């Protein structure tokens, strides 16, 4: 599934207070995907990433997700077991 992910400026995320470092072009995998608890999170609707990563101090990438959980909340945020970090996109291209 194609989706969009925000990161801190240094390509890190801080899920549950733990720093996770990402790199463009790499693939990452976890054992399970549970929305807001485990796995890799991204948004199907590009502008939804702004709810989680404000434009100042953030970067955005297209990502490819596999093993996506069926769980959903109030927006297009999804969670997957596997994520491939694609190209960086500007805020104007979201």
Please report, for each region that a protein language model flagged, where it lies by residue.
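Short, glycine-biased loop/turn motifs at secondary-structure junctions and
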Residues: 1-94
């Amino acid at each position: 599934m194609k989706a969009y992910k925000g990161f801190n400026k240094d390509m890190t995320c801080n899920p549950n207070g733990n720093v996770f470092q990402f790199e463009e072009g790499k693939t990452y995998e976890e054992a399970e995907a549970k929305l807001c608890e485990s796995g890799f999170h991204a948004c199907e609707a590009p502008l939804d990433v702004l709810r989680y990563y404000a434009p100042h101090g953030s970067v955005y990438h297209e990502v490819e997700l596999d093993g996506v959980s069926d769980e959903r909340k109030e927006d297009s945020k999804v969670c997957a077991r596997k994520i491939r970090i694609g190209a960086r996109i500007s805020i104007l291209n979201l």
